[in-house]
Swiss-Prot record:
HAMAP family according to UniProt: Urease_gamma (MF_00739)
Catalytic activity: urea + 2 H2O + H(+) = hydrogencarbonate + 2 NH4(+)
The protein's annotated pathway: Nitrogen metabolism; urea degradation; CO(2) and NH(3) from urea (urease route): step 1/1
Protein's GO biological process: urea catabolic process
Major enzyme class: hydrolase
SUPFAM superfamilies hit by this protein: Urease, gamma-subunit (SSF54111)
UniProt cross-references to Pfam families, sorted A to Z: Urease_gamma (PF00547)
Subcellular location(s) of the protein: Cytoplasm
Gene: ureA
A cellular component annotation (GO) from this entry: cytoplasm
Annotated keywords: Cytoplasm, Hydrolase
UniProt-recorded Gene Ontology molecular function terms: nickel cation binding; urease activity
Protein name: Urease subunit gamma
Amino acid sequence: MNLSLREVQKLLITVAADVARRRLARGLKLNYSEAVALITDHVMEGARDGKLVADLMQSAREVLRVDQVMEGVDTMVSIIQVEVTFPDGTKLVSVHDPIYK
């Protein structure tokens, strides 16, 4: 299988997000990398589904609550920016304060 660098990065994010989902299901709090991967995956999948940028910017802020992440992670993640492909082209989605307080 010949994957481009971008495809490898997307695959790694998806795997990390899957690990994060399983840890949340076990009641564990997520670290920085897991939290970012989960929110990034939400944006990537939403774009693939054809959702609007504005809708993704809002819904991504509802993926995680502060009680689901380790102490201090919410302050470390002030913005997540994801470049994703929508049906009408590639766009940068910026999610400010992505962890719901």
